[in-house]
Amino acid sequence: MIIKNNTKIAIIGLGYVGLPLAVEFGKIFETVGFDINISRISELEKGYDSTLEVDIMELQESKKLLYTTNTSDIQSCNIFIITVPTPIDEQKKPVLTPLVQASEMVGKLLKKDDIVIY
């Protein structure tokens, strides 16, 4: 994969996998961190990570990172990295609902030559 000047990355899900990834990409590339949890986005915009995956200094170093709950903010992205939770149920089977919902959402936004990574 060749990274071009117009690369814009969307990280879908800002948990223990997605947030550190978004922070690192946001130091170099235009990056949008998307999550459905409004309070999660609010705390990150204020420079705080309640999961303690990323410290305040790292959050501040990601100058090209935008946090959002709005799908219109990720429409212009051309790389989508889906990092939503896959919890298990009582029978220890994966609950794929978050993954399916994220995939459907991204599927509605895809354009020719876009890349989706799971």
Model-derived features: where do they sit?
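Structural/interface elements that position substrates and couple domains in central-metabolism enzymes
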Residues: 1-118
